[in-house]
Amino acid sequence: MSSHSDPIGDLAAAISRVLEGRTITELTRLSGGASRETWRFAVDGEPLIIQRQRSGDTRDMEVEASVLRAAAVAGVPVPRLVISGRFDEGARYIIQSWVEGETIARKILRDDVYASARRSLVGQFATALAAVHSIPIDDVAGLPATDQMAQYRQSLDDLNAQLDQAHPAFELAFRWLEGNRPASARRTVVHGDFRLGNVMVGPDGLRAVLDWELAHIGDPMEDLGWLCVRAWRFGSERPVAGLGTREALLAGYEAASGSPADPDALRWWEVLGTLKWGIMCMLQASAHLLGFSRSHELAAIGRRVCENEYDIMLALEGRWSTLGVA
């Protein structure tokens, strides 16, 4: 048996098998995260994209595929799902249509070609999120339903025990969040990571909502609050993705969804989103600090923890009376 290894050829052959023997050309790797790889290829001149699951990832890509199908039916702009399943060697995959456009936030926020898009994106985001939240929960069996605050409270406690660090700004945020949690009777499908970087944008505006692997059942205001987190403004002072105002986002969402959108709930989820991102930065940095995965990139992410502490203080400004702080 030959010891020759051809990963690209092997992947092309695997894709060809699931596409009934079609010829695969132009197979090019685009990215490779911790849990999945992304490749572009063509079949009969049509550009497609495949995401292949890495070993060790416990998330079910079939659930993600079912969300994509339901999202398309609900009117969410998403890439067309071609096929999903499991390769012979066991790795799960999703193949989708290629959507032309830009995902890099700084280009979307600054390049002249997107000037017209910038004027319409907040409204388009509101409409897209209203469609996401209209997906019938029964159509997407298998989505987790977790208490986000409890999950990240436990994560911070575990990190504090391992790293022996103090993060008083995070504790302040938890204290405020616990005392001001909004009452919400709505439970919907939530995208879980809706922001610049996870949407495809063209000169005409929003073209597709991408990256559904964190979808879950929760409060729909979570998606709107995450979109307002300061880290996702990429240097712009405009609070909604660096593009517009919270008032415009809420008005557009109410018009598209027919459901009231509480500005206080939006702020609550914005604070929680900022806290979550800070703890997520800690989690990534801890992999380096604890020796699990030595990486300059992971170590550098650790410096963003203090940025999020600062962002939390800004987000809580003017709310000290609810904390009992003079």
Regions found by a protein language model. Give the residues of each.
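Conserved N-terminal boundary motif of the eukaryotic protein kinase catalytic domain
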Residues: 21-28
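Juxta-kinase regulatory segment immediately upstream of eukaryotic protein kinase catalytic domains
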Residues: 1-20
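Activation of the activation-loop gatekeeper triad in protein kinase-fold domains
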Residues: 210-215
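ATP-binding pocket architecture of kinase catalytic cores
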Residues: 28-172, 182-186
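Active-site activation/catalytic loop segments of kinase-like enzymes and analogous catalytic loops
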Residues: 222-258, 272-291
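Catalytic-loop of the protein kinase fold
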Residues: 189-191, 196
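Conserved protein kinase catalytic-loop anchor
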Residues: 187-189, 207
